[in-house]
């Protein structure tokens, strides 16, 4: 069992993000995982993730606040405990259009080597 305390979770800077503070809870800098990694992102008002393809299968779960996710010509406003699944390669965008911060749990698959 490997525990990552919020206070000691390593931060990272995701590409094409602005007004976002991100940390890894499991995987990568937080310790090895086999099939996925988990992050926590804080989106300030006006913050967002620019349009880019999901590098691997991705799930977002909004923990607090609201975020607007745009993908494949669809737009969805997500509130607390709402989630969205993005298949690998889906071009997506995330925006905090509200006046308050939002917290997002991020689960992303890792590249699997062919067996």
Report residues per predicted region.
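Ligand-binding loop in jelly-roll beta-barrel domains
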Residues: 88-114
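Conserved short histidine dyad/triad with adjacent acidic residue
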Residues: 23-27, 37-54, 88
């Amino acid at each position: 069992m490997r525990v990552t305390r919020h206070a000691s979770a390593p931060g990272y800077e995701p590409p094409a993000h602005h007004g976002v503070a991100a940390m890894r809870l499991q995987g990568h800098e937080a310790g090895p995982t086999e099939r996925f990694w988990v992050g926590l992102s804080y989106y300030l008002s006006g913050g967002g993730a620019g349009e880019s393809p999901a590098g691997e299968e991705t799930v977002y779960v909004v923990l607090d606040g609201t975020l607007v996710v745009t993908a494949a010509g669809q737009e969805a406003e997500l509130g607390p405990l709402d989630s969205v699944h993005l298949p690998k390669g889906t071009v997506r965008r995330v925006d905090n259009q509200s006046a308050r911060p939002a917290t997002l749990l991020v689960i992303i698959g890792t590249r699997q080597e062919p067996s």
